[in-house]
Amino acid sequence: MMDVAEVEENLFAASDAKLHGEMCKALSTMYCKVSSIFPSLEAARHRSKAGIEAICSLHVALEKAKDVLQHCSQCSKLYLAIAADVVLLKFEKPKSAIKDGLKQVEDIVPRSIACQCQEILNELEGVKFALDPTEKQVGADLISLLQQGRQCGDSSDASELECFHQCAIRLGITSSREALTERRSLKKLIERARAEEDNQKE
């Protein structure tokens, strides 16, 4: 069985998150604890259809959690701030799926492993995802700027540019290197949105 620290080291460090660091830390801990007992769950499950489905459901839930963590470590900071409410839902979905998966598996594994599942479920009950107030405010400010831009056209008003610059600074985009990284992340996001024909994201 893998050690929790070993799984966590291979997956995610809190410093990897460009934004929503506390939520990433909580989800990463959740992911690592379940992943550390997953081989035991897989080995102990019944070879029935229900057992296979339960393990598959839990595996899918873990993959969803991993995707969210990677999203927050690779995506644009500006986008993560603007789409904060959507990102919050992205965290809630794998948490709920992991809980459901553990409950299914709990009924088909030996008592000793079922107890480990229950311990994790008890911990999950105490996990409450919430947006960082500062990041949420920056996102609101950026949305306001974008809405003003749509109403006024392609404005180059100095006060708007300064406000945008301050938002970037509050998100930690303070050097030319960080600005370049952000531009690359935005470019990838726009290219993906165009490929998916996602006009809202674009």
Outline where the language-model segments fall.
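Alpha-helical bundle protein-protein interaction modules that mediate dimerization/oligomerization
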Residues: S48-K201
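Extended, alpha-helical interaction "stalks"
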Residues: K18, K201-E202
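N-terminal amphipathic alpha-helical segments
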Residues: M1-R47, G101-C117, E123, T134
